[in-house]
A protein has these predicted regions:
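Alpha-helical scaffolding within the catalytic cores
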Residues: 66-78, 99, 103
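Short glycine-enriched nucleophile-adjacent loop
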Residues: 43-54
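Residue-level signal for short, function-critical loop segments
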Residues: 40, 66, 91
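Gly/Ser-rich "nucleophile elbow"/oxyanion-hole loop immediately N-terminal to the catalytic nucleophile
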Residues: 4-41, 56
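A conserved short beta-strand
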Residues: 55-67
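Short beta-strand immediately N-terminal to the catalytic nucleophile in serine-hydrolase-like folds
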Residues: 36-38, 63, 88
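C-terminal catalytic histidine-bearing segment of alpha/beta-hydrolase fold enzymes
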Residues: 86-88, 94-148
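Extracellular/periplasmic catalytic domains that process cell-envelope and extracellular macromolecules
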Residues: 28-29, 52, 78-81
Length: 148
C-alpha cells in the first residue's frame, strides 16, 4: 500500500498515532518517554513525523538517515525547543553520507533541540544494534517531562 514520502502525503503518521493510542489504552506507557526511531528511510521518517507540532513522540533517535536543513527550518519552533534527539550515523555510510548527519546535528541544535550525536568510524549504512542499550539509557536520562 501507500506509505510516506518527502514529496507526498504522510499516511503513516496517523497510523502510528492510532497504534500508540491503542497501546497506551491497554498498557502503561510513560507519556514523557515515547521514542520514535528508525534506520535509513525510517530514520528520515522519524525526523519528518517527529518534528510535527502534534507528534506524540517525546524523543527521536534517527540512525543513518537522510536529512535536509529545510526539515529544521520548517519545524515548529516550540516543538523543536528542548526536543531530545539522538543521531547515530556511520562515517562510512555510502547511501546517506555522514555530512547529512552533521548537518542535522548543527541545524537541529541551532533550532534549540537537545541533540546527542554519535558518529561511528567503522559503520557504513547499517543499524548499530549494539547501541540499543545506550539509546534507551539516553532516553531515560534525556528529560522531556510535561512537553509533547
Amino acid at each position: 500500500g501507500s506509505t510516506w514520502s518527502l514529496s507526498g502525503d504522510d499516511v503513516d503518521t496517523p497510523h502510528l498515532a492510532q497504534i500508540l493510542e491503542f497501546v497506551s489504552a491497554h498498557w502503561r506507557v510513560d507519556p514523557n518517554r515515547r521514542l520514535l526511531t528508525g534506520m535509513s528511510d525510517g530514520g528520515t521518517f522519524s525526523y519528518v513525523s517527529g518534528l510535527e507540532p502534534a507528534s506524540p513522540f517525546t524523543h527521536l533517535a534517527p540512525s543513518c538517515a537522510a536529512f535536509h536543513p529545510m526539515l529544521a527550518q520548517m519545524a515548529d519552533a516550540e516543538r523543536l525547543r528542548g526536543l531530545p534527539i539522538h543521531i547515530t550515523h556511520g562515517a562510512l555510510d555510502w547511501m546517506f553520507p555522514v555530512e547529512m548527519a552533521r548537518a542535522a546535528r548543527d541545524a537541529l541544535s541551532a533550532g534549540g533541540a537537545k541533540v546527542s550525536y554519535r558518529e561511528l568510524d567503522d559503520l557504513s549504512h547499517v543499524y548499530p544494534a549494539e547501541l540499543n542499550g545506550a539509546i534507551l539509557d539516553w532516553m531515560a536520562l534525556a528529560d522531556r517531562s510535561g512537553r509533547r
